[in-house]
Swiss-Prot record:
This is Nucleoporin nup132. It holds the Pfam family Nucleoporin_N. GO terms for cellular component: mitotic nuclear bridge midzone membrane domain; nuclear envelope; nuclear membrane; nuclear periphery; nuclear pore; nuclear pore outer ring; nucleolar peripheral inclusion body. GO terms for biological process: kinetochore organization; mitotic recombination-dependent replication fork processing; poly(A)+ mRNA export from nucleus; protein import into nucleus; replication fork processing; transcription-dependent tethering of RNA polymerase II gene DNA at nuclear periphery. The gene is nup132. SUPFAM superfamilies: Nucleoporin domain. Functions as a component of the nuclear pore complex (NPC). NPC components, collectively referred to as nucleoporins (NUPs), can play the role of both NPC structural components and of docking or interaction partners for transiently associated nuclear transport factors. Active directional transport is assured by both, a Phe-Gly (FG) repeat affinity gradient for these transport factors across the NPC and a transport cofactor concentration gradient across the nuclear envelope. Belongs to the nucleoporin Nup133 family. Component of the npc107-120 complex which consists of nup85, nup107, nup120, nup131, nup132 and seh1. Interacts with nup107. The keyword Methyltransferase does not apply. InterPro entries: Nucleoporin_Nup133/Nup155_C (IPR007187), Nucleoporin_Nup133/Nup155_N (IPR014908), Nup133-like (IPR037624), WD40/YVTN_repeat-like_dom_sf (IPR015943).
Length: 1162
């Protein structure tokens, strides 16, 4: 007895256990096994079911694997180099690891071969109620072992051997390659030399026996001759397929033997294995390729299969190589004329190509309407439709199932079978495949419908990927490249439509309604997440707006899920809920019931935001009965809050938790207004907060009175309701903060930070949040208020709460902790709070608060009243001087304070080492002080008039009365009066007068009484002196100089002054020297103003008003800017006319030259 049949140690002893033993008596078509299988993929035309999820570890680790799957009995026979394994996949129900019988095989001498697995097959039993037999062929030695049943093979280790053995006489370097069952008890074996052997398992009497017979073919005869001549270098013949029609087929007596080169031999097994036809199909195949693929090269036949319904129809799988990849094609031939086959159908595999040549198998479905091309990493289903009238009229299309070899390990086994589950059920067609790491799967074809269009195909494939690609351990590869071929707008529309189908439970891949609505909602939410995960994993080019829309769907689904959970937790039925009865009635117009509520939650997820408005409206309607039914009204408010909080908070929670899925920040939004922060939602949230607060305030104020009207047990209920409302108010505050923050971020993202709309929302948020936080503090939830303020970085509220809740050292410690925690932003808010609340001196208290940010604060704020003191304390006199100068220049309006600030600034400048910047600031300070000095000099002549009129009772219209007194009997133009009124008003208030306005006032001295001017200094001199301290443009300075000199000339009547009749020299000299023009020239010369930049007119005619259009005049002359430019122009023109009159009628120009010479000699 050989080692194959000899007693061996069976390591799988558990296989013999009655509990785990394979039962072949069990019904082979038990539907329970199929119904409980796990679907890896369910498509419209097919589904992929997991029949066995895991092999035994010994099988997985014993590579390479081969084998076959016998669907009649539900067994799998798997071969390796060391053993063969038998297992039943039907008892695993798709998940469990089944009992496995192991048959160790003897080691063989490689004999120069790289090694090959044993050839094995189940042998059908003579009786239907018996186990099948087992046939094992060792490929190198040619030894054959046969057992009439698996039980006998299993008992080989324990009892006397009950098997039979034979031997194939192989030539040197010959090995067995293929094993084919031609009838139940007859098998055909082919070798690498092309020889064929017939193995008969019954003798003529029908008893079990093993007999081997060599086929009488040309190749066999040739091999025999070479053997007798002792020539052993036989040519190797690459037989790729050894196929016979299915058992019980009328054509089963034929055997087709195909070689890779295209050679085909047909044997008739009834005629003692006679060769009836031999041909070379390569010319036919090449002719087909030349018509469709001119660049094809390297034609090779990979496999053949025979149509089970038409034994004359044989399909071949051929491949060829173009410039880049290997391409595949199915060519079907009709062998009605066995010597001259004709081409019936050609189907190139458009959806598959490979860079290297892959081992491939071709299978027909039992109906002949489908072909399965099984490769290592893919299964291609080719659907073939046949016209009943004309067999040549055939169309085909294909479905591709790609396998992830990293998960599955690659397909090593495949077979086809047709089974019927029941008497009246529709026959199904299946292909069974096996992979090392993912077990056995069944591909069941149940439809041959062609997709309506490309978009429907893409949507269906995308939907399949969403529902099945994320199943744990799924070996199918869903990385569909065709998604990138569709246009971007179409793909985005498909994605959004699919999301809506999932959200509204319209997808056919969603499971039937669970008993628990919570599970159904969770399934939909998970599917939406998987849709986004798949889009991200495939790196599809979709716009971010699509992702925002999907995120909104997920938010609403999550909100409904949490809301339903709240209902299930808090209210076991709708009848226990006061608010949901009314809400469902309003929304569905039907009686409130559990089913109505459930139906609404199933089909109205998209309208979940309506519940917020409905809950709030019901609260308002119930509020009118608070005196009659206080507890019921508080319950309604509490339930409404539960609804609103569940919806709003869960939406934000989903957005936060799904950031990794969507790769979208929680602070970014789509173009549409976020549904959780629409203007209507913000209003409703604020009103609900106020409503809850009002109910709490009333309950706190009237607790004792209300409790007296209740029974003892109801008092505890009331306290519990009030406590719950307080907790809800804290949660409502957070929801309101989230909604407003979200609204602000969306407007900033859409319109920018400077949009007018955002300012309105920020102002409303600033007002409301102080109210919300203060409310929490008022009801005794100060710690919660501080927590919320900390969470949302509401620094202003934090500061206010600290001053409300803490005192002295506790307050100092809290503020210092926040300064350390939040840094400069909190510091700025705190410092602003000090200034706004009259606590500015706190900023100078260096012992109490951290001042590390104070310098930066003063740089960013215009608080010069305090910041200069801080700079002075730090010894930064330059900065202190600069701040004082800014304060005096831009902010201060009172004369005395401005003079003090400028004086201090000057003092600080003297304390700083001199540099160019300090010199400029010092000049500016001197000029400002000079302006104030001139103003004070002028006001001294006005204030006595003011005091006199006040003592006379002139309290009303005092300014007009003072101006009238100053003008006296003179006639002044309107613009002169207006300038005087403005200046006098500021004199009375002690305010600073602008330099240009004071210039105008001084230059209008010709319209005031003469007795107002004291001493030798004229107003015109002061005006020129003031002009030197200003920083006007050159044009403006020239205009003012001419105006001042012109009005100084017009101040006196030169016709009278220069009239010498009846005057002696002394009188003439006195009048000449007392003129305003002379005194102004004298004062200017004596005080050196001409050396400081003032230009003396060369002639008085140059002082005329000429060459100014209205626009230029407005830009340089304030009275023209604030008044009527036409009237101002008339006044200036009249002055020029009068000046020209003097120059024409008198020798004023000569006198002016004499005045200049006289002043020069002083």
């Amino acid at each position: 007895m050989s080692s194959i049949l000899g007693k061996r140690k069976n390591e799988e002893v558990v296989s013999f256990s009655p509990l785990k033993r394979i039962s072949v008596e069990k019904s082979l078509l038990d539907s329970t096994a199929y119904n409980n299988s796990l679907d890896w993929l369910r498509s419209k035309n097919f589904k992929v079911s997991c029949l066995l999820k895991h092999f035994n570890s010994k099988i997985i680790n014993d590579h390479p694997l081969s084998g076959s799957c016998y669907t009649d009995i539900g067994y799998a026979l798997i071969n390796s180099r060391k053993a063969c394994f038998i297992l039943s996949y039907r008892q695993s129900l798709g998940t469990a690891e089944p009992p496995t019988i192991t048959f160790p095989l003897p080691e063989e001498d490689s004999n120069g071969f790289s090694g090959q697995n044993a050839l094995t097959a189940f042998v059908p039993s003579d009786a239907s109620d018996k186990e099948p037999g087992l046939l094992i062929v060792m490929p190198i030695s040619g030894r054959i072992a046969y057992w009439t049943s698996i039980g006998n093979a299993l008992a080989q280790s324990y009892i006397c051997p009950q098997g039979m053995e034979s031997l194939i006489k192989l030539l040197p370097k010959e090995k067995c390659e293929h094993l084919c069952c031609s009838n139940p008890m007859k098998f055909i074996i082919s070798t690498n030399f092309g020889r064929l052997f017939s193995v008969q398992l019954r003798d003529p009497a029908g008893q079990p026996d093993v007999s081997v017979q060599l086929f009488a073919s040309d190749i066999s005869t040739f091999s025999t001759i070479l053997q007798k001549m002792k020539i052993f270098n036989y040519p190797s013949i690459h037989i790729i397929a050894l196929k016979s029609p299915p058992l019980f087929s009328p054509y089963q007596h034929l055997l087709y033997v195909a070689e890779a080169s295209g050679l085909l031999e047909i044997y008739d097994l009834k005629l003692e294995n006679k060769l009836v036809s031999g041909m070379n199909l390569s010319p036919i195949f090449k002719q087909v390729l030349r018509e469709g693929c001119p660049d094809a090269s390297g034609l090779e036949v990979l496999d053949l299969t025979i149509c089970p319904t038409n034994g004359n129809l044989v399909s071949f799988l051929v491949c060829w190589k173009n410039s880049i990849n290997y391409r595949y094609m199915i060519i079907s031939l009709d062998f009605s004329d066995i010597s001259s086959p004709s081409v019936m159908n050609i189907h190139p595999l458009y959806s598959f190509s490979s860079k290297s040549l892959e081992s491939s198998k071709l299978h027909y479905s039992s109906s002949g309407n489908s072909l399965f091309v099984v490769l290592t990493d893919a299964v291609i289903i080719v659907h073939v439709q046949e016209d009943d009238k004309d067999i040549v009229s055939r169309t085909s299309w294909e479905e591709v199932i790609r396998m992830n070899t990293n998960v599955s390990g690659g397909i090593f086994m495949s077979t086809c079978y047709k089974y019927v589950l029941g008497k009246y059920s529709i026959p199904t067609e299946s292909c069974f495949i096996a992979t090392p790491y993912s077990g056995i799967a069944e591909i069941e074809v149940h439809s041959l419908e062609h997709p309506a269009n490309n978009e429907s195909l893409v949507k269906s494939k995308l939907e399949e990927a969403v529902f099945y690609s994320f199943l744990p351990g799924n070996p199918i590869d869903f990385s569909c490249n065709y998604l990138r071929s569709i246009k971007k707008p179409e793909l985005e529309r498909i994605i959004v439509d699919l999301g809506m189908d999932i959200l509204n439970s319209r997808s056919t891949h969603l499971p039937p309604l669970f008993a628990s609505l919570m599970q159904h909602l969770s399934c939909r939410l998970n599917s939406l997440n998987n849709l986004v995960r798949y889009i991200r994993s495939m790196s599809l080019d979709v716009d971010r707006q699509v992702l925002y829309k999907l995120r909104v769907m997920g938010e609403k689904c999550n909100s409904v899920r949490y809301l339903w959970n709240t209902i299930d937790t808090e209210f076991s039925t709708v009848s226990h809920s006061l608010i949901f009865q009314r809400i469902i009635y309003r929304l569905t117009q039907s009686a409130s019931s559990d089913n109505a509520l459930r139906e609404w939650f199933l089909h109205n997820i998209e309208s979940i935001d309506q519940l917020i408005a409905q809950a709030h409206e019901f609260c308002i309607d119930s509020g009118s009965r608070v005196q009659e039914l206080p507890l019921e009204v508080l319950d309604v408010i509490m339930e409404a809050n539960e609804v609103i909080l569940a919806i709003q908070s869960s939406a934000l929670a989903y957005r936060r938790e799904s950031q990794k899925i969507y790769k979208l920040s929680i602070d970014t939004f789509g173009e549409e207004v976020p549904w959780t922060s629409t203007p209507e939602t913000l209003v409703l949230l604020c009103r609900q907060f106020e409503l809850t607060r009002s109910a709490l305030v009333q309950s706190h104020q009237g607790t004792s009175d209300v409790e007296n009207t209740f029974k003892i047990k109801d008092k505890g209920v009331l306290r519990n309701v009030v406590s719950n409302l307080e907790v809800q108010l804290v949660a409502l505050t957070e929801v309101c903060f989230d909604a407003y923050s979200e609204r602000i971020r969306w407007i900033e993202q859409r319109c920018g930070k400077d949009a007018s709309e955002i300012q309105d929302v920020k102002e409303a948020f600033a007002v409301n949040r102080r109210f919300w936080v203060q409310t929490l503090s008022d009801i005794g939830k100060g710690s919660s208020a501080i927590r919320i303020a900390e969470k949302y970085s509401d620094y202003r509220s934090l500061v206010e709460l600290c001053y409300q809740l803490y005192e002295d050292n506790e307050l100092t410690d809290a503020l210092n902790n926040y300064l350390d925690l939040f840094g400069i932003k909190f510091a700025f808010i705190l410092y602003d709070y000090f200034v706004e609340n009259g606590m500015a001196l706190e900023l100078l208290n260096s012992d109490r608060f951290n001042k590390s940010y104070l310098k930066q604060f003063f740089k960013s704020r215009d608080y010069n009243q305090i910041s200069w003191m801080h700079d002075m304390r730090l010894g930064d006199y330059d900065a202190a001087s600069h701040r004082l100068l800014q304060l005096a220049t831009k902010q201060e309006k009172l004369v005395d304070k401005k003079e003090s600030e400028l004086s201090l600034s000057k003092l600080f400048l003297y304390a700083v080492p001199s540099n160019s910047g300090n010199i400029r600031d010092l000049v500016l300070v001197e000029q400002k002080l000079e302006q104030l000095h001139i103003q004070k000099m002028v006001s001294k002549s006005v204030m006595p008039v003011v005091e006199r009129l006040r003592s006379q009772g002139k309290k009303y219209q005092l300014v007009e009365a003072v101006v009238d007194d100053l003008i006296g009997a003179k006639v002044a133009p309107v613009i002169a009066r207006q300038v005087m009124q403005r200046v006098v008003k500021k004199f009375i208030a002690g305010q600073v007068v602008e330099a240009t306005e004071l210039l105008e006032y001084l230059s209008f001295s010709l319209y005031r009484r003469e007795d107002l001017v004291e001493g030798e200094v004229t107003d015109y001199y002061l005006a020129l002196r003031l002009l030197l301290t200003t920083r006007l443009t050159d044009d403006a300075k020239r205009f003012y100089e001419n105006t001042i000199w012109r009005r100084a000339v017009l101040h006196d009547n030169w016709i009278q002054v220069l009239d010498t009749q009846g005057k002696n020299d002394a009188i003439i000299e006195t009048q000449f020297r007392m003129s305003a023009l002379y005194r102004t020239l004298e004062a200017v010369t004596i005080n050196g103003l001409f050396h400081e930049g003032l230009i003396r007119p060369g002639s008085l005619s140059s002082c005329k008003f000429e060459g100014y259009d209205p626009q230029n005049l407005i830009s340089i002359y304030p009275p023209a800017r604030f008044g009527d430019v036409t009237e101002v122009t008339k006044v200036l023109n009249r002055e020029s006319v009068k000046l020209d009159h003097y120059l024409t009628k008198t020798n004023l120009n000569t006198c002016y030259i004499s005045m200049c010479l006289s002043c020069d000699t002083i």
